[in-house]
């Protein structure tokens, strides 16, 4: 009976809640930060959260704090369970500390958690946490020394004034030494968002206390494929660092002082061996970048004190043949220097914007090499294994900072021309009197599109044939494949990928004495794995949020079809042409004798798009989808 009553109550509550109801509500979220002269910060967070339904109860059954024991100390100071009936339960005794689940990066990150136990809708969790330290470790010492941030004497923070759940009140307060000249700025406030953050400051002796308050934060209804929340919703950046040049000088110095880029005799010998056949400086850069990309496996094994901004030294990386992005970047810097280049480590933020306030807006380490003419070229050995690029164009329109002895300013990678990432499909086919189709179809690709096509080879060799056959059978399930030819995947640097299919497809077209109806095989979005724009939902006519695709791209399709007879009339799908720098589209059908030719071109000009680009982008995608689904009709 009790179970039935609980189920009945749950159903009633679900029916009573609006369709957009949130599972929990944050009643208040208050953070107080005190910064010391060294940059060490003491952070106290006080939250009270209400479970609105049983899903919220489940979500709040455990409260967790993620931290790195090498660089941060955390504790729960108070955890109370406020029952809806007014009873209050202290659950602070149920505190656990476990090593956090890890995949590919094994640095010993931990989770401190409190088991709340059973909750009912309407119950509230109130907890107070204390933290000192930072996200990344550098060089540790005694006592609080290991909790001082890498850029000693400086403080930075990124505070989201957005939430996935409703927040009735959010307060962020920081007490900083006035002499530190704390700088701050609110971002993403404008037409769509009125930040509505109240800012107060008071001077207390040699300190200035800044308080930022916002009431009634409501969750944003995100549009599909929108940018990261920190790029489109209100956030606060704070930093005592004077500018990006200072951060650049620090990043250069901390790794040079550690000796991250000193080549060992073994590394020098390997570099000499690799560049022996290079004819130009670009040859040497490409050879070394791809060697690091393909031979240093991505796996983060902790070196103990020193993880974070410090790049592992060359001896460790070359011996272990594994590491995370910073280790692969460090290995490449070392090898380039061993080859006589001026090379430097750099930091970037993958798939999220870096703003002008010099807070720690980085999640990825890369490499910069200086050419003889003084220009820099960005290299990313982490993102280009088996990719015919030196810097992944999936990172175009992305901010980065090079660590230089004289300092560097924040910069952004440029657009990569769509022609650098072409997908070309060429088919020669013949329709028989029985409506069958036979012939060949070839796909070639370059850049990021090349990598997407060659995804069929990213498995055991025994599975390659099945994967390639599947790509054709996705658009023609009845296809009988007689032969497949492809480029050597192990020698991917020598030429762009190319795969050719020879096939026959029974009952491909509808045919009678006077009419022939079919959709060209090449129009059916063959190898759509290389055309991520096709995964966009084109139903919405407008967008208010910027959005992102995998990469810029050019799709070119041509098919020559030999018909079983000559036809007088051709009826084909009508599409609206698109001519826009962000996206463009064109197609043609023409008939000569018993030959029909189909051609299509789709250009996607960016990785990151503005809402104003949606109309052209949407029409381009819709056109390609329509041609894939709409047949041509030929009559005599």
Each model region followed by its residue ranges:
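A sensor for short, sequence-defined functional sites
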Residues: 22-636
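Bacterial Sec-dependent N-terminal signal peptides
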Residues: 1-23
């Amino acid at each position: 009976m009790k179970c039935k009553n609980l189920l009945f109550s749950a159903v009633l509550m679900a029916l009573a809640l609006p369709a957009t109801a949130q599972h929990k509500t944050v009643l208040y979220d208050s953070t107080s930060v005190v910064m010391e002269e060294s940059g060490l910060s003491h952070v106290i967070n006080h939250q009270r959260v209400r479970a609105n339904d049983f899903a919220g109860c489940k979500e709040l059954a455990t409260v967790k704090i993620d931290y790195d024991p090498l660089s941060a100390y955390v504790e729960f100071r108070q955890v109370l369970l406020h029952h809806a009936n007014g009873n209050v339960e202290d659950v602070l005794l149920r505190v656990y500390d476990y090593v956090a689940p890890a995949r590919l990066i094994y640095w010993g990150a931990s989770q401190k958690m409190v088991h709340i136990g059973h909750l009912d809708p309407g119950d509230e969790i109130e907890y107070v946490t204390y933290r000192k330290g930072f996200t990344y470790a550098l060089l540790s010492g005694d006592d609080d020394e290991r909790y001082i941030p890498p850029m000693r004497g400086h403080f930075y923070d990124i505070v989201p004034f957005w939430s996935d759940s409703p927040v009735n009140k959010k307060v962020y307060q920081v007490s900083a030494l006035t002499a530190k000249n704390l700088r701050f700025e609110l971002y993403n406030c404008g037409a769509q968002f009125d930040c509505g953050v109240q800012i107060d400051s008071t001077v207390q002796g040699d300190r200035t206390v800044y308080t930022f308050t916002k009431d009634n934060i409501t969750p944003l209804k995100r549009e599909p494929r929108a940018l990261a929340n920190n790029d489109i919703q209100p956030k606060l950046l704070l930093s005592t660092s004077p500018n990006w040049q200072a951060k650049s000088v620090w990043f250069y110095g901390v790794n040079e002082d550690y000796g991250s880029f000193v080549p060992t005799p073994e590394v020098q010998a390997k570099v000499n061996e690799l560049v022996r056949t290079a004819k130009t400086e670009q040859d040497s850069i490409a050879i070394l970048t791809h060697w690091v990309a393909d031979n240093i496996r991505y796996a983060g094994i902790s070196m103990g004190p020193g993880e974070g901004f410090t790049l592992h030294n060359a001896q460790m990386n070359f011996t272990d043949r594994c590491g995370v992005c910073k280790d692969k970047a460090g290995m490449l810097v070392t090898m380039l220097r061993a080859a006589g280049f001026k090379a430097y480590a750099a930091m970037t933020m993958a798939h999220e914007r870096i703003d002008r306030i010099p807070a720690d807006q980085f999640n990825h380490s890369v490499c910069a090499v200086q050419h003889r003419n003084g220009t820099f070229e960005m290299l990313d050995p982490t993102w280009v294994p088996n990719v015919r690029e030196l810097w992944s164009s999936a990172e175009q329109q992305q901010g980065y900072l090079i660590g230089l002895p004289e300092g560097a300013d924040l910069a952004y990678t440029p657009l990569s021309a769509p022609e650098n990432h072409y997908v070309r499909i060429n088919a020669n086919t013949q329709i028989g009197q029985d409506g069958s189709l036979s012939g060949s179809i070839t796909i070639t690709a370059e850049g990021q599109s090349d990598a997407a096509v060659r995804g069929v080879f990213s498995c055991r060799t025994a599975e390659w044939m099945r994967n390639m056959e599947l790509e054709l059978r996705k658009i023609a399930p009845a296809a009988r494949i007689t032969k497949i030819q492809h480029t050597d995947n192990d020698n991917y640097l020598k030429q762009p990928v190319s795969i050719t299919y020879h096939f026959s497809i029974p009952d491909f077209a509808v045919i009678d004495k006077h009419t022939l109806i079919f959709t060209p095989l090449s129009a059916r979005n063959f190898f759509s794995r290389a055309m991520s724009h096709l995964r966009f939902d084109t139903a919405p006519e407008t967008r208010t949020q910027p959005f992102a695709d995998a990469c810029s791209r050019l799709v070119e399709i041509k098919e020559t079809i030999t018909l079983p007879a000559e036809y007088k009339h051709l009826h084909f799908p009508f599409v609206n042409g698109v001519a826009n720098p962000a996206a463009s589209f064109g197609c043609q059908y023409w008939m000569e004798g018993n030959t029909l030719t189909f051609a299509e071109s789709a250009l996607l000009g960016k990785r990151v798009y503005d809402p104003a680009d949606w109309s052209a982008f949407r029409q381009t995608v819709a056109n390609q989808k329509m041609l894939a689904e709409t047949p041509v009709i030929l009559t005599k």
